[in-house]
């Protein structure tokens, strides 16, 4: 059973309308990711899907983030990684990318704040300015605005297993 968390579709739709290119990075095999995203009707939002078998390295190694940033031709200073696990935060830090961590999702029962991400949020809709009320949107410290208006949001492995590392509830069954 897969359930998309509240606000996920709205957030992905809004980011897409803003021209934000999004990628999904997961340690799970790539062949399972796209069908699940399509089943949940959110696959179209992701330009790149990087599975655990796409590259030789897996998170927390930053190789997948570097790969996506190279493909998007966007520097780390204009990228944002959304995740819900220690591996996500470590990968983002190693790539020099700011990381927004979701307080719910996959982190082996440990508070994600222990990993010291750039910011911890409880609702993905905080990525949408004004969605949860005036002034509710997030502001990351020292962000370098993109001159072209394009940026990339890299979402992680649970985006198909938890959709955006907390976006969906799904129990892996081998």
Residue map of PLM features:
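Short secondary-structure boundary segments
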Residues: 27, 53, 85, 102-106, ...
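Conserved Lys-Pro-Asp/Glu-containing loop-to-beta segment of HAD-superfamily phosphomonoesterases
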Residues: 58-90
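Short, acidic loop-to-helix structural element flanking the phosphoryl-transfer center
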Residues: 1-24, 30-34, 62
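Acidic, Mg2+-coordinating phosphoryl-transfer loop and its flanking beta/alpha structural elements
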Residues: 81-119
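Glycine-rich phosphate-binding loop signature in dinucleotide/nucleotide-binding domains
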Residues: 18-20, 72-78, 134
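Conserved H-loop
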Residues: 42-47, 75, 121
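Membrane-proximal basic amphipathic "stem/tether" segments
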Residues: 150-174
